[in-house]
Amino acid sequence: MTGGFTTVYGRNLVAELPNFVHRPYLVVTMDDLWPRFSTSLDGPGMAAVHRVRTLDVSELEGIVDDLPACASVIGLGGGQAVDVAKFVAWRRRIPLFQVPTAMTVNAPFGHRSGLRRDGIVRYLGYAVPEAVYVDFDVIASAPAGLNRAGVGDILCYHTAHLDWQLTRDLGREEPQWPYDERLVTAAGERLDSVLGALDDIHDVTDHGIHTLMEAHRWGGDTFHASGWNPRHIEGVEHFFFYNLERRTGRHFIHGQPVGFGIVLGSVLHGSGTDEMVAALHRVGVDIRPEAMGVGWDDAEAAMRTLGAFVREAGLWHSIADERPVDDAVVSEVRDRIVAAYGAWESTS
């Protein structure tokens, strides 16, 4: 149904970049990554390195204006780095080369940047990379938790489909996004591929990397290929994540709050909770609030205020519009997660 961006799988790919990207090039990356890759990219062909500090659109506008002249941009990192690289490429109208360093999200394969405006996620801009370079050794060397968390952006298809089917059944479809079984089926194939490779993804084998990144490749591209339609790939589980992020002011490893949201959405729909909890636990994504650096009180507040949040943010229709999160829902979500992962034991 969609081909996605040109994607190159291999090894020693970062060191080759200075030999062919347009010069001078800007590297967009993170503080913790640059020391590792600077020897491969720093040199006479580099215009500058930008270390991402913010995803706020108003701040990024000024940052992009102040960056030095460059002929291309290399996005090197996880979701934040590649999203900012897309934004720079779009604003400067220059070629883009993406190098994900972990499998955390599908951002390297998406056209728009997931940024923040007034604390709410907004997808802005449009950039198509010359290629996405997936280096097996680079990915495998990332913290295992980051790589495993990438399944959140695929397992979320489960709750997204439940939301879209509910919207159809209630006659509340958005005019631009009528229910499309073909999209649901295509997304389901990617979901099944990841569910069938959970052990390889957990161990970050070449097969696990290829399986999850190919699913991300499809997921990142289909938003545009389906006419900017998010309904088959994102729903209430992401809305919970956005609300938790806004309420706490924290940045999270994407798949952890999304994984928690998948459990919440499954409980609200009354469908597939056991399967989703088992998959998240088996692959090694710890969705307990404490593992994210917050408490159960934060998670509970984000659950209970979800209905108000989706209306305030103008998000598309989901189970959050139809079923309030009451004591029974909160208790079931907590019980399911604690039963699978155990109670949190502080190491302090």
Regions found by a protein language model. Name each.
Residues N19-F20, D65-P68, R122-A127, A131, ...:
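Solvent-exposed alpha-helices and their adjacent loops that cap or buttress functional pockets
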Residues L67-V88, R92-M103:
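A short, small-residue-rich loop immediately preceding and capping a beta-strand
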Residues W90-R190:
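A glycine/threonine-rich phosphate-anchoring loop and its flanking beta-alpha core
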Residues M1-S72:
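ATP/NTP phosphate-donor binding region
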Residues P35-R36, Q80-F87, V105-P108, I233:
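Short glycine/serine/threonine-rich phosphate/pyrophosphate-binding segments
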Residues I154, D163, T167, G171-E173, ...:
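C-terminal charged capping/lid subdomain of soluble metabolic enzymes
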Residues Y179-E290, V294:
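Active-site segments that bind and position negatively charged phosphate/pyrophosphate groups
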